[in-house]
Amino acid sequence: MNRREFTRLTSLAALILPRQKDWGLITDVNQLHPNAVKKQCIAAFKRFEQVWNFNDFWKRGNTFDACLVFADALHKKWPADKDVIAVLKSIDSMLEENYRYFKSFDAGKMWADDFGWWGLMAINARKHLLRSGNEVLADKYTKLSIELCWQQEKEHAYDFSDTAKPVPHGCRNGDADGQDKGVKNTVTNVLFFLLSCRIYRLLSTEKQTGNEQYLEMAYHQWLWFDSWFKLTGYGYLQQLGNDAVLVMERPTAFFDGSDYKNTTHPTWEKGWLWTGDQGMLMAALTELLNIKNDIAAWIMRNHADTGFNSAVFENSINHYIKSLAKGVNLGLIGNTDNIIREAPFKANFGPEFGNDYLAGRGILMRYMGQLGNKAGGVNFKKCITATAAAIWHTQDVVTNQFSPEFTSNESDELYAQQYRKLTGLGDPAMKWQIQAMNEQQKFGVCQSIGLDAFGALINQL
């Protein structure tokens, strides 16, 4: 650690830890000072209140999901705290405005994955609104999640044909009007996978009927991913060694007749992967484990899969979760500072879609926090703590605005070298090329990354 980094980290110690502690020596998250963390969380939210109301459909859904998951963690940790209660009340009115925003759009003009982000957010909105006693708006968000978001993906993105090679079905990230068919990338498919699981669990918990179609689609999405993962020759799962893997941005197969040759929308780069996909896939697989018995019973009732074996099914899910967790730990966390990073690919950072992929680190931490202290058998406490610390220390001290960059140039290059040595792929270290990004969108997304990090941190206290 160089002098600059040491100064940065020890300065942060005075903010987030008891004054006598040295951040650079902290290995146990229990040494964090909860009241200091709570104050930082409140400050982070107050800034989010100022920047969240921007105009961008998918980013709006994702950033508010970050806010809701963060607020849920706050509530669980400090349910009676007056400042936390004030945060929850503010979110009530923000959800009213967000619902009006969603309804103002023509659904036919939106991309398929946009509805996945909003569908997941709507389920968390329902939970929040029921807790605050607003059943009317909670039911509107349930309808939004199921009848608008899930149905849109099913009708306009899912490939019902059996002809796609080498793997049939899956979802295309096209627009609902069909002007652009899009590509069957990971984010579109994992969003539909996770959303199907969560809608099924929601309806089952509330004893509602007519929920088998969500169970069926969750299983079909599992088959799509599992089929690809078994085709090891195509490298959809990046093998990092020691049973550690990361999932690529999209599955590709370059042969005559393949339906997976698309290298545009956005421009593909060999080995390219995104942090957000890793967190969502671990979450979807974990949700699948929670409904494994229901799936087995549904298959038996409907004779849906003659080769189904419940033990093999469960073991496969657990294997993928553990392998992905190991992959994140090995490939997406800097060895020198324990900070969670985006994989070093121009496709992530570049001007074409850097403003979209910017949010990935937060999305990964969001699901890390929800999955618990040892997701997939890996303890992520240290990296969540270090990342939240770095985000806090690099904020604007006047506005409490978080930055897209919260690591040093030197440590970024060390990480890029670490990644290339591990995989043989990737580019030199680079900064986020988001100069053309609307400023308020940038502020909102960056603040949501911080909320994701602090939400995960709260769950470690």
Model segments located where?
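N-terminal export signals
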Residues: E5-W23
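CBM-like carbohydrate-recognition segments
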Residues: W23-D113, W117, L137, E155-P168, ...
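Active-site cradle of extracellular carbohydrate-active enzymes
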Residues: S196, N211-L288, A325
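Aromatic- and glycine-enriched pocket-lining scaffold segments that form the walls
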Residues: T142-K143, L148-W228
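The core hydrophobic/aromatic register in alpha-helical repeat solenoids, strongest
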Residues: C67-F70, M121-A125, S196-I199, L285-L288, ...
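Inter-helical turn/loop segments and adjacent helix faces that build the functional surface
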Residues: S132-G133, I199-E212, L288-I299
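Mobile, glycine-rich extracellular loop/lid and propeptide segments
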Residues: K109-A122, T142, L148
